[in-house]
UniProtKB/Swiss-Prot annotation:
Entry cofactors: Mg(2+); pyridoxal 5'-phosphate
Name listed for the protein in its UniProt record: Biosynthetic arginine decarboxylase
Positions bearing N6-(pyridoxal phosphate)lysine: 101
UniProt lineage: Bacteria, Pseudomonadati, Pseudomonadota, Gammaproteobacteria, Aeromonadales
Catalytic activity: L-arginine + H(+) = agmatine + CO2
Amino acid sequence: MTNWSSKDSLKVYNVPYWGAGFFNINDAGHVTVAPDKSRPDAQIVLSDAIEQLRQSGLTTPVLLRFPDILKSRVDALFNAFGQAIEKSGYEGDYLCVYPIKVNQQRRVIETISQSYSDKPRLGLEAGSKPELLAVLSHHHEQGSVIVCNGYKDREYIRHALLGNLMGHKVYIVVEKPSELEMVLDESARLNIKPNIGVRAKLASTGSGMWESSGGSMSKFGLSASQILALIERLRGLGKLDCLQLLHFHLGSQIANIRDIQGGIRECGRFYAELRRLGANIEVVDVGGGLGVDYEGTRSQSHCSANYSLSEYANNVVWGIGDVCREFDLPHPTIISESGRALTAHHAVLVTNIIGAEGVEMNDISAPDDDAPTILQNMWKGWLDLRSEDPSLLEIFHDSVADLGDVNTQYTMGLLNLEQRAWAEMLHQNTCLALKELLNPVNRNHRALADELSEKLADKCFANFSLFQSLPDAWGIGQVFPVMPLAGLERPLTRRGILMDITCDSDGQVEHYVDGLGVESTLPMPVYGEHEECHVGFFLVGAYQEILGDLHNLFGDTHCAEVWLDDEGKMDIRNVVRGDTVDQLLRYVNIDPSVIRENYQRIVSHPALDDATRKALLDELELGLQGYAYLEDE
């Protein structure tokens, strides 16, 4: 371990694979960010950003946004599709449409919308009335594309139609049969020609956590017979020319490229058939599904993807192009709604470790000669560990069984508290000793080695709410890369489990990227008694903010944008303070003014003097105006 360096930590945390070239660990052991791919040497030290924010009065937890990463991801997506179009000889265009449901924060939408000079090639997608109104106000350029998905009522459809009068190109995607009649009615009433799209239910579907959002059992989309009925309805009204867009969606976070290949082939057949039936389809929207490799394993795990961005683009472009060449059809504009791939990398949640409980060897002596038999048995097992060829698995099983018997006898009143405590400490010592003796390379030892690694890991209490900031980690077991921000030039000799500050046993991180796999504990260096430890949760820019809930009334964290200036230096802008206690109380209809009145009445008790009364009221006011998370005094 004496030759350990930051390069070793890079491998342990698998940073080169999930970091997409944005994240690194420098020689001093600090995590860095290179947000602008055109300036790879311009690096930001995350610890420096946190220190600068602290000097300005902001404590952790804080969400750091890197708008330059958003721009880099937009460029990467356009470059991948541009190269695929050029290599394949595809005659249509590519249009990137950002579905704002992935992250509706105003600054995120603005950064994405403004990040490409050729604005008509970058559109927005809405899935509800509030999202549509937001999208209509964000796009200012003539001809900006807006795709309208989701369930729709007449008001939604009217807003979409009126968007065309504002100069936008608004596609209303019919996702259930009843929507067509509403579109026809409202367009006739407003005398606005609609741009209609249709979402096809494919037989193909992606595997993984979100597979139910695609395929024939999806809650959205039209079956083959329903699409035929839609075409005949439009043909009968002389409005078949309004049907301009074909849409499908395999599901979010598609891990296996073969699922994408199958979906594209099936979509291509739908395109060919719709053209054969007279529909003037100009746009094929392949939806979302472009995966993010959260683990860095390049695998078919639901938190990974076994393909690159360029491979995805090649499969989409070549797949649609092959159908067009086979049937001599015009090459449609290709739209992808790759929101997760655009936004995931740009945000990092940073928080501090407020305390830790480690598992260490206990200094205990042999039981007295007249001690109960069960304690004598446990001590014998402990001594057996020092024999020439100990049976490690048997010793562990016996120790677990003996401890169970101790707890039973304690409950029955046969053992006292001191004896129970002695047994617990001896069992802990046995586990620690076994952990050092087990060989993980030995297949027979591997399961127990993993069990003890988790059992003996440090409990690290992190100043954040898993339910607010990483809801997918709790709800669906999503893996997010996490690592300390400093000290990584030192050997990672400890294992930890991160626990949040909510009053819920589910509030802990259960999965950690470790090498080319995922483990149940986090590798960590040893920190000094007065050395502060900050940890970063990476790739949290997609879905997490909007899905977060208010468990224990922990609300939004502080947020700040971290830019690179013209000289490649860190420039922190657009700082937004997190929710205060009084704001959170209002969310659940608790009026802070009523709390103040009740406090006034309670402290008016004659037993309290004026100074004490004032101190209590001042403390209340500080609490109401303060950050919901733990703060240093």
